[in-house]
Amino acid sequence: MKQILKILVFIVPICIFAFFYTYLSKDNSYPGADYRVFEIPSFDLTELYQKTELSNEDLSGNFLINVWASWCITCRVEHGFLEKLSNSGIRIIGLNYKDDRSDAIEWLKKYRDPYELVIHDFNGSLALDMGVTGAPETFLISNGKVIAHYRGEVNQIIWEDVFIKTIKDSEIIL
């Protein structure tokens, strides 16, 4: 019994230290931010308007992928900021998530389309493969790899603190 107590006295403080070190060393300032690097999953889907086939091989360079849907209220809130980014020359590809094609097209007509192209992910397969849990979500892509991801509305503060910081740290040009 004394042996077990001695071991516990030694192990418990180490476990507590490890827990707090791990928790405190994380950047918790933006809980929706994720900086895991991974390749864009392979996909075969269609473009929203023309219904032409698209795959991951059709996407190149540095750009944002914005996951959105016509039924998403927060997407409407975020939309004005995406227009601002698009008008400043930032390439944005829309990933229309679990949405009816005609509803999505009508939504973009009503609120204007900031996207270079829109992938219609009607059943959410690509979004699921990318780890999407809902809309909106935005991914920063560099040469086929996700280098930053934000769950939730992107606004000026998130843009600067999450995406611009990653762009500068990675030395990429959008």
Each model region followed by its residue ranges:
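Short, solvent-exposed mixed-charge patches
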Residues: 170-174
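N-terminal targeting signals for export/organelle localization
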Residues: 1-46
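Hydrophobic beta-strand anchors of alpha/beta hydrolase catalytic cores
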Residues: 64-65, 92, 138
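Structural microenvironment flanking redox-active thiols in thiol-disulfide oxidoreductases
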Residues: 76-111, 122-129
